């Protein structure tokens, strides 16, 4: 066998072996492929089954959610229906109450109308009486003229006096008689009017005052800040006093640090600055960080906080007295009065008290109670700005009321409550009276000893300046002046006129809270000795 044949045989064997090997691989691959296909098909079936189960689960959940949503919607609908029914019932009840109040108001108006009708009838009757009295006086004047003419002729006939001499005698007699009659008439009229006025005024004032309850404690000019321990005083002073100097410079308040245990005193005449200082110092003590930068930060912060607090004070006071629909700026200005004092009395508390007293007086007198309260509440509003704006607190308050378009009666009340202008309504007079009552009640106000002594001296000086006065004494803390006259200089009739003159001088020349009683005493003593 040649080499070529051997090679071909070898190649043939190799090909056969390769063919057999390939056939085996193909069969194996086919089996693997079938296995993979079956496995994939099984997984696909599992996925389909899982998806189907998931879909059924989601469907069940959707059904459950749908039922729950339908139930929730039904409950919400029922709840809204109940709320609407409750609101309807409440509105119907409010409507019934409103109708009831309107009916009561109508009855009150009917009663007032009947009262006015009766007053008109009384006025007509008084007018008729006045006409009759006028006619009677005219006839009396004619009779007196006739009698005077007869007297003149008789005097001329008897005394042979001239017309001028007779006239002088008659005038002298008439003048003396009229002086005595005038003094008696004045005394009787005053006694009668005083008795009736005192009785009526005491009744009205007692009814008004007993419905008002107020504090009788006057405001102080110092505030006390408590400290956790005395070691805090050194921290407040600071190194070389820099903390206390910064505090006093920023607040304008004196810080008094003495031997008082665990306390620091803040002294200053301006309550607003003193309140800012008190708030700042309390926060510094509580925080513990006391240095100039922190002091400056807290002072500025508390200034803004106090502005907000003043508005709250004004709103609360306006609500208390029933002064509705006040301009927000007016309420803020009224809130400033919480930090103002007059003779030691808190001006906002005084305004609230005047509002209540004026309202009670107006109710007793048949005037508009709400308007009287509003006017009384605003009567001292000018005191909130009298340090910042030129003019008296009356002028400032009047301009503020005009600016914010208050009722003309309120404007006139503010302008007239110290007698600067003429009161144009009964409410203005009632507010002035309420102002005097609030200021004059015991404990409401406090005067310095210098002003107190000066007022007593001025009172005695006015009384002793009249002719015939021997001496005068101011009694009861200046609420009464007793004038002793010389009996040989003034008669009993003349001291009645003297009392009125002293009273007028005091009203014109002095400012004082409340009333001053003027008592003139004429005493005659006859002395002899038995030997």
Swiss-Prot record:
It is found in: Cell membrane. It comes from the Bacteria. Residues 221-281 form the KH domain. The lineage of its organism: Bacteria, Bacillati, Bacillota, Bacilli, Lactobacillales. It holds the Pfam family HD. GO terms for molecular function: RNA binding; RNA endonuclease activity. PROSITE patterns: HD (PS51831), KH_TYPE_1 (PS50084). GO terms for biological process: mRNA catabolic process. The keyword Nuclease applies. This is Ribonuclease Y. Endoribonuclease that initiates mRNA decay. It comes from Lactococcus lactis subsp. cremoris (strain SK11). The keyword Cell membrane applies. Belongs to the RNase Y family. HAMAP family: RNase_Y. GO terms for cellular component: plasma membrane. Keywords: Cell membrane, Endonuclease, Hydrolase, Membrane, Nuclease, RNA-binding, Transmembrane, Transmembrane helix. Residues 347-440 form the HD domain. Its EC number is 3.1.-.-. It is a single-pass membrane protein. The chain crosses the membrane at residues 3-23.
